[in-house]
From Swiss-Prot:
PROSITE patterns linked: FUMARATE_LYASES (PS00163)
HAMAP family: FumaraseC
Encoding gene (name): fumC
Miscellaneous field: There are 2 substrate-binding sites: the catalytic A site, and the non-catalytic B site that may play a role in the transfer of substrate or product between the active site and the solvent. Alternatively, the B site may bind allosteric effectors.
UniProt GO cellular component terms: cytoplasm
Species of provenance: Rickettsia felis (strain ATCC VR-1525 / URRWXCal2) (Rickettsia azadi)
Protein name (record): Fumarate hydratase class II
Record InterPro entries: Fum_hydII, Fumarase/histidase_N, Fumarase_C_C, Fumarate_lyase_CS, Fumarate_lyase_fam, Fumarate_lyase_N, L-Aspartase-like
Family: Belongs to the class-II fumarase/aspartase family. Fumarase subfamily.
Pathway(s) this gene product operates in, as recorded in its UniProt entry: Carbohydrate metabolism; tricarboxylic acid cycle; (S)-malate from fumarate: step 1/1
Length: 461
């Protein structure tokens, strides 16, 4: 049999199961928004706990919280950050667009934990009040966007950047000895002039290097925090200097360069910084899609495709075709990239709907951004472990395709002209003979002249 306690808010009393620490507003949200199962991301909850910890410290230093209250809030946030109350943050993304109910969920749980410590009884509003103490000098309108920025930075630094560095290092290590492997290039999915396998992979390496640079550039605005703007950006009910001191506390706690936003009206009404950051995630997805698809194409086969790369064989690929092995890591990564691109569309639409003084698409913005970060991070690490590290060049196939390519004829342009070189290529293709044989047949070059000019090793820059 479940036990219940009575909590109350401005709408009256409501029953809450005794084992939970949340209060009336959280319970109402649970009952009013039974929409989907997409809960607020755990790292956003952590960001809110960090926010409340730092706010309580500043309020104490400003003389607005007595020591007992501030200390109890501080201890409660520590316990939340240690993961002790994970089941007490049950709200879904599909709620008020300001994130008010999740902000109050955090306020109520912190107050309840603190009150249990001070009175041996959870819940209630005394001696620690969720609004008057935990939320002091704050509004959901500045607290939730602040938590959005903190969560984005933490997820990026803890998950995405390490994953991309892992991929970068693996690509560099894998390709460093491939500078002598000369293969045929392809443009428009047609044969082109030669390059080395290392040169081909250097393009992928640079894409990832640029991705890391883009992240750092896009984070510059995400480091700016809305806290202190309160309801509409005017800082009503917040003391002068609270915003600056708060940002310093968050920076100190997280070891990240957070600062107070210079214009709080922009920070509440718009989320351009996060839309821009989502655009960076979208660009990274574009880069990864290209890299993964190239590796898939180069590894196609084993007998009837390009077959220039051997991809690791991780599991059976077909329920009907015995012995078939598929590029499953590539498929997983490219599906993630598709999801991230879709997430960016959602973030773009949500960001464009910041009406007047408050954008009320905040939960869906941060949900999609954090999902994109998580999916990209996990899929990249999986791709590295189960694909990139096991890539091996198929030297025999690479040499065979290179030597058969008609586009080696490009080396003849400076010597016999474009038109004559084209005649050789067409003649070779039409009759299924080599370029050398076609050049001799057309009386344009001797075998000796051809061998002196058409040297793949001299065509790679």
């Amino acid at each position: 049999m479940k036990n219940y306690r009575t909590e109350s808010d401005s709408f009256g009393e409501i029953q809450i199961e005794e084992k939970f620490y949340w209060g009336a507003q959280t319970q109402r949200s649970l009952e009013n928004f039974k929409i989907g199962k997409q809960k607020m991301p755990e790292i956003l909850i952590r960001a809110l706990a960090i926010l409340k910890k730092c706010a309580a410290q500043v309020n104490y230093e400003f003389g607005d919280l007595e020591a007992k209250i501030a200390t109890s809030i501080d201890k409660a946030t520590d316990r939340i950050l240690e993961g002790e109350f994970e089941d007490n943050f049950p709200l879904v993304v599909w709620q008020t667009g300001s994130g008010t109910q999740t902000n109050m969920n955090m306020n109520e749980v912190i107050a309840s934990i603190a009150n249990e410590e001070l009175t041996s009884k959870k819940g209630g509003k005394s001696p620690v009040h969720p609004n008057d103490h935990v939320n002091k000098g704050q509004s959901s309108n500045d607290s939730f966007p602040t938590a959005m920025h903190i969560a984005t930075v933490l997820a990026t630094k803890q998950q995405l950047i390490p994953a991309l560095n892992n991929l970068l290092t693996s690509l560099q290590d894998k390709s460093k000895d491939w500078d002598k492997i000369i293969k045929i290039g392809r443009t428009h999915l047609q044969d082109a002039t030669p390059l080395t396998l290392k040169q081909e992979f250097s393009g992928y390496i640079t894409q990832i290097e640029y991705a890391l640079e883009r992240i750092e550039d896009a984070l510059k605005k995400v480091y700016l925090l809305a806290q202190g703007g309160t309801a509409v950006g005017t800082a009503i009910n917040s003391k002068i200097g609270f915003d600056i001191k708060f940002a310093e506390k968050v920076a100190e706690f997280t070891k990240q360069p957070f600062k107070t936003a210079p214009n709080k009206f922009e920070s509440l009404a718009a989320h351009d910084a996060l839309v821009e950051f989502s655009g960076t995630l979208n660009t990274i997805a574009v880069s990864l899609m290209k890299i993964a698809n190239d590796i898939r194409l180069l590894g196609s086969g084993p007998r009837c495709g390009l077959g220039e790369l051997h991809l690791p064989e991780n599991e059976p690929g077909s329920s009907i075709m015995p012995g078939k092995v598929n590029p499953t890591q590539v498929e997983a990564l490219t599906m993630v990239c598709s999801q991230v691109m879709g997430n960016h569309v959602t973030v773009t639409i949500a960001g464009s709907n910041g009406h007047l003084e408050l954008n009320v698409f905040k939960p869906v913005i941060i949900y999609n951004i954090l999902q994109s970060i998580e999916l990209l991070s996990d899929s990249v690490n999986s791709f590295v472990t189960h694909c990139v590290k096991g890539l091996e060049p198929n030297i025999a196939r690479i040499n065979d395709l290179r030597d058969k390519s008609l586009m080696l004829v490009t080396a003849l342009n400076p010597h016999i002209g474009y038109d004559n070189a084209a005649k050789i290529a067409k003649e070779a293709h039409k009759h299924g003979i080599t370029l050398k044989e076609a050049a001799k047949k057309l009386n344009l070059l001797s075998e000796e002249e051809f061998d002196k000019i058409v040297v793949p090793e001299k065509m790679i820059g």
